């Protein structure tokens, strides 16, 4: 009986490690991605806006780290450094990795979007990270560029250095 329990435990551990590794797979850029069904701020099913019509600047944010890169993002918005006729930006809140209740995060996001008219949708199960091969996005602010053809051409996670900011501006200019 003891051997059976130990074998069962080892099997469960191996399955758990394998499942975690699948979520951690990072695909090299560029690669094609799909428009996923996510949730709006009222928790209704929705898809990503602008898909197939415009290049997309996507802010994929863990609410626990929403202030990461704050100064850089404010500079982008205020000075329209990533704006252009061929690109639109929107946010996706990574609800799976936050300690905050989803309803509170959605309510705060609704309040903010009423003021700034930004488009924000939510990802309740880290589907964007898993399906797009982003790897672990917990506690990270992720900035991505997806072409209107559905190709993920830029992805940077975490805190941006000055060099990262310059690289992003150089790349985003191609898609504006």
Feature locations, PLM:
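Positively charged n-region of N-terminal signal peptides that target proteins for export
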Residues: 1-4, 19-20
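N-terminal "domain-start" segment that seeds a small globular fold
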Residues: 20-47, 67
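Structural micro-motif
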Residues: 33-34, 115-119, 134-144
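Structural microenvironment flanking redox-active thiols in thiol-disulfide oxidoreductases
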Residues: 66-113, 129
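Thiol-/selenol-based redox modules, centered on thioredoxin-like
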Residues: 139-176
């Amino acid at each position: 009986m003891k051997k059976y329990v130990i074998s069962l435990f080892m099997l469960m551990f191996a399955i758990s490690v394998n499942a975690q590794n699948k979520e951690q797979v990072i695909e090299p850029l560029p690669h094609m991605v799909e428009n996923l069904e996510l949730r709006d701020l009222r928790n209704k099913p929705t898809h990503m806006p602008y898909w197939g019509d415009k290049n997309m600047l996507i802010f994929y944010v863990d609410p626990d780290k929403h202030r990461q890169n704050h100064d850089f993002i404010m500079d982008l918005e205020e000075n329209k450094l990533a704006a252009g006729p061929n690109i639109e930006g929107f946010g996706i809140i990574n609800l799976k990795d936050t300690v905050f209740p989803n309803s509170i995060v959605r309510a705060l996001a609704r309040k903010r979007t009423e003021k700034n008219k930004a488009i924000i949708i939510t990802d309740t199960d880290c589907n964007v990270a898993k399906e797009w091969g982003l790897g672990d996005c917990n506690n990270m602010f992720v900035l991505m560029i997806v072409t209107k053809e559905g190709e993920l051409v830029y992805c940077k996670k975490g805190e941006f250095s000055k060099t990262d900011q310059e690289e992003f501006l150089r790349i985003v200019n191609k898609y504006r």
